[in-house]
């Protein structure tokens, strides 16, 4: 029997700059699943943890960065055939200080800040590219405009 699980967060890190935004891309380490694939911050929601708490924790664990502003953006499904589970990923956008030092966790070996168009090309998974497009559409002016009160977590 196939199950549905809300168990994953994806977080797109944005370094705002008047000259143009940059998006953090992370390359997976050789010892992990999908070695050398480029992705966004991605991780599991721990038992008893809200998705937004998981997002902040995963950003800290995978990059060492502190989230300055957090927005919920979309929910995306994907299928884990080995677990017979439709996994729902809660997608967030996090504004961070792009000048702050990055401390990569064990899952990643490289990082690169890229303009949004280049990040769209870098991400391996089509769902990540679509989510980044949604982030850019909703937050492209620097905030969520008329829906700020609904999307902004803090």
Feature roles, as predicted:
Residues 4-6, 18, 33, 84-87, ...:
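A generic fold-level signal
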Residues 65-75:
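A short coil-to-beta-strand element that immediately follows conserved catalytic motifs
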Residues 20-61:
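Conserved Nudix-box catalytic region and its N-terminal flanking loop in Nudix hydrolases
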Residues 127-154:
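Charged phosphate-binding loop/patch that engages nucleotide di/tri-phosphates or the phosphate backbone
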Residues 91, 102-135:
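NUDIX/MutT-family hydrolases
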Residues 6, 76-101, 112:
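Active-site-adjacent beta-strand/loop module that shapes the phosphate/pyrophosphate-binding cleft
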Residues 1-24:
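Conserved N-terminal beta-strand and adjoining loop/helix that marks the start
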Residues 14-16, 29, 95:
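A generic structural motif
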